[in-house]
Amino acid sequence: MTVNGKPAEHFAGTLLEYLQRHGYREDCVVVERGGEIIVREQFSRVKLHADDELNILHFMGGG
């Protein structure tokens, strides 16, 4: 499994569980897996696999 272009240990769970475990707020991220955007409503249904390539974009506020 790779996350943002870096090797990551395979996580046996859902995308939502992965995001929560790694400190991401699911309402502040966009996730792409294998070239396709995963809509937020699907995060809890998407099972992660050892060969997944994820890109997680985290939005930050500021001014």
Predicted regions located by residue number:
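Ubiquitin-like/PB1-type beta-grasp interaction modules and other compact soluble beta-rich domains
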Residues: M1-G62
